[in-house]
A protein has these predicted regions:
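C-terminal lid/capping helical subdomain adjacent to the catalytic/cofactor pocket in oxidative enzymes
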Residues: 25, 389-481
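Core beta-strand elements of the Rossmann-like FAD/NAD(P) dinucleotide-binding domain
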Residues: 27-29, 237-247
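N-terminal Rossmann-like FAD-binding beta1-loop-alpha1 element of flavoenzymes
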Residues: 29-57
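Active-site substrate-recognition segment that forms the wall
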Residues: 45, 61, 79, 112-121, ...
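Glycine-rich FAD pyrophosphate-binding loop
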Residues: 48-72
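Dinucleotide-binding Rossmann-like beta1-alpha1 core, especially the glycine-rich loop
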Residues: 76-165, 323-325, 329-335
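Short beta-strand to alpha-helix junction loop
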Residues: 91-100, 127-137, 182-205, 218, ...
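Flavin (FAD/FMN) cofactor-binding and adjacent substrate-gating region
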Residues: 120, 130-218, 225-229, 338-356
Length: 481
């Protein structure tokens, strides 16, 4: 008799209407992906197009794909490359650029009309204000230009030619501060990750029936229980029945950690959810303008971006507010947060080290104030004026219904806050992806890594020449590794 490890995996309060004996899909699947955001759908696309695995499925608890963290309202819509993100070292930028170029090459394979509906081409820059920041950019430029060939170092007059509102204090007067920028000419910079997710699903669905493949797409399907029958068989129970699989990949953002810990994996981690809010202004920028990140803070500095959803508006943000929720504006996820919080002395040691620094403490307190109506605009205006000095409070409006949650992991053993995407791989036929920023940008790179692991453990085959031709060659060739 098989020893069964049963795990209750609720990540939304909802009535269950299906008996545990009803089968959602017949037979044993090669891989089931749990979570239909951009990470999960990218993996489904890769497995369906580039492997010989025959039976694949994706389970998404909501009525459509990418309605949470991957929705365009819940992230900055940026394809992060490491060129204008000053918290990235050269090696980290090289790593991120590779993943960004995989994504951009995928987009370039789409018909022009579809690509333009998903993404947009704009210029971008990181702005330095004052002597210290300008010197920083001047030192950074010769190093990063080796990786980003089109990059240019701009002074005040050059910036004025591409982003006049950045340089003007008012209609007729230039701002007094010294200005410099690392400027990147127009390229694919912006992506609606919800539309991208649906594109991945369409591509995967088109493989249904090709070479006897079966691709099962399941919306409104919430996982309620996972049974680990043995190292190569999992029984996933949902509100619509159960499905069996040889391999499972959980791509449910912060809920991935909750599911993992219910299965006694990743117990060394806690979660620090960081919520981000945004503000709208009129159309004041021609492209993305980032500012230099404070090295003492693990959060992105405020930036301005032409919005891909609200055409004709510029979105400023994000703020960074620690919040005890795994999903913004979903109080049901408070209980879920408490499950992955796991407070102990090690965790409080991490908190103490984070907040004993006055810079961090002031930053967090200030971000709490950014959520207070009326007061928030006056406080946030100071940050925004670093980019557009002529803006007033009348020009800003709080983006109601915008802003997501980034589940930052804390390793309680090493007592460190982990920045960037996380993965829990216990070495069995199950993987858990926890993907805060820049997880959307890295969806195909992360998916390629998972695809290779899956095929290695299932004795499957990856068509590597096809992967290289499709993702590594094209308008954004990955020839710098």
């Amino acid at each position: 008799m098989l020893r069964v490890k049963s795990v209750f995996c609720r990540y939304r309060r909802q009535a269950r209407h299906v008996s545990s004996g009803e089968e959602l899909a017949a037979g044993v699947y090669d891989t089931v992906v749990i979570g239909g955001g951009v990470t999960g759908t990218a993996l489904l696309f890769l497995l369906s197009k580039f492997t010989n695995l025959k039976k694949l499925a994706i389970l998404e608890r909501r009525s459509d794909f990418a309605l949470v963290a991957s929705h365009g309202k819940n992230n900055s819509q940026t394809i992060h490359c490491g060129d204008i993100e000053t918290n990235y070292s050269f090696e980290k930028a090289k790593f991120i650029k590779r993943y960004a170029d995989l994504l951009r090459n995928y987009l370039c394979h789409l018909p022009a009309e579809k690509r333009e509906g998903i993404s947009s081409v704009t210029q971008k820059m990181v702005l330095g204000v004052g002597e210290k920041e300008c010197s920083f950019l001047e030192e950074r430029y010769p190093v990063f230009r080796k990786l980003f060939k089109p990059m240019k170092l701009y002074g005040k007059s050059d910036i004025h030619s591409v982003e006049p509102r950045v340089v003007l204090k008012n209609e007729n007067t230039l701002r007094e501060e010294t200005l410099a920028a690392l400027y990147m000419p127009p390229e694919l910079t912006t992506c609606d990750y919800q539309k991208l997710s649906n594109s991945f699903v369409e591509c995967a669905r088109s493989m249904n029936g090709v070479d006897s493949k079966k691709i099962s797409i399941n919306l409104n399907t919430e996982v309620t229980n996972i049974e680990e029958a043995n190292e190569s068989l999992y029984i996933i129970h949902t509100n619509r029945g159960f499905i069996k699989s040889r391999f499972v990949v959980v791509c449910a953002c912060g809920h991935s950690l909750m599911i993992a810990q219910k299965m006694n994996y990743g117990l060394e981690y806690s979660c620090l959810p960081v919520a981000g809010s945004f503000y709208f202004s009129g159309n004041v920028l021609n492209g993305k303008v980032y500012t230099i990140q404070n090295p003492a803070l693990p959060f992105a500095a405020v930036h301005g971006d032409p919005d891909i959803i609200e055409k004709g508006k510029t979105r400023f943000g994000p703020t960074a507010l620690p919040l005890p929720l795994l999903e913004r504006d979903n109080m049901n996820t408070l209980v879920d947060f408490l499950k992955v919080w796991n407070p102990d002395l090690s965790l409080f040691h991490v908190y103490f080290n984070l907040f004993k620094d006055m810079t961090m403490l002031k930053y967090v307190c200030r971000n709490f104030l950014f959520e207070i109506p009326i007061l928030n605009k006056y406080l946030f205006l100071k940050d925004v004026r670093k980019i557009i000095p002529s803006l007033t409070t009348r020009d800003l409006s709080y983006c109601v219904g915008y802003g997501g949650v980034r589940p930052q992991l804390i390793n309680k053993v090493s007592k460190k806050l982990i920045l960037g995407e996380g993965k829990i791989d216990p070495g069995k036929n199950i993987i858990f992806n926890i993907t805060p920023s820049p997880g959307a940008t890295t969806c195909l790179g992360n998916g390629e890594s998972d695809m290779n692991i899956i095929c290695e453990r299932l004795n499957g085959t990856v068509d590597r020449p096809a992967v290289r031709k499709f993702l590594y060659q094209g308008d954004y060739p990955v020839d710098y590794l």
